[in-house]
């Protein structure tokens, strides 16, 4: 079963910039741990680590 999850930038708050968020899906049965992906943050103008939030 696919579940909608939100990925949030981990570096933006440290630098005082707005956070960037992405929506993606994951399969709850096969992927039990939280997702971490490198995605582009337009506020920082570079790729940063984005982690799944609840």
From Swiss-Prot:
Keywords from the named record: Ribonucleoprotein, Ribosomal protein
InterPro entries associated with the record: Ribosomal_bL33, Ribosomal_bL33_sf, Ribosomal_zn-bd
Q: Which SUPFAM superfamilies match?
A: Zn-binding ribosomal proteins
- List the GO cellular component terms: cytoplasm; ribonucleoprotein complex; ribosome
Please provide, alphabetically and separated by semicolons, the GO molecular function terms listed in this UniProt record: structural constituent of ribosome
The answer to keyword Zinc applying to this record is no
Q: Which GO terms describe its biological process?
A: translation
Instruction: Specify the domain of life of the species encoding this protein.
Output: Bacteria
For this chain, the family text in UniProt reads: Belongs to the bacterial ribosomal protein bL33 family.
In Swiss-Prot or TrEMBL terms, this protein is called Large ribosomal subunit protein bL33
Source organism of this protein record: Opitutus terrae (strain DSM 11246 / JCM 15787 / PB90-1)
Name the gene.
Answer: rpmG
């Amino acid at each position: 079963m696919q579940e909608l999850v939100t990925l949030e930038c981990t570096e933006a708050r440290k630098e005082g910039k707005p956070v960037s968020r992405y929506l993606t899906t994951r399969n709850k049965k096969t992927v039990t741990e939280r997702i971490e992906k490198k995605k582009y943050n337009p506020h920082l103008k570079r790729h940063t680590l984005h982690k799944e939030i609840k």
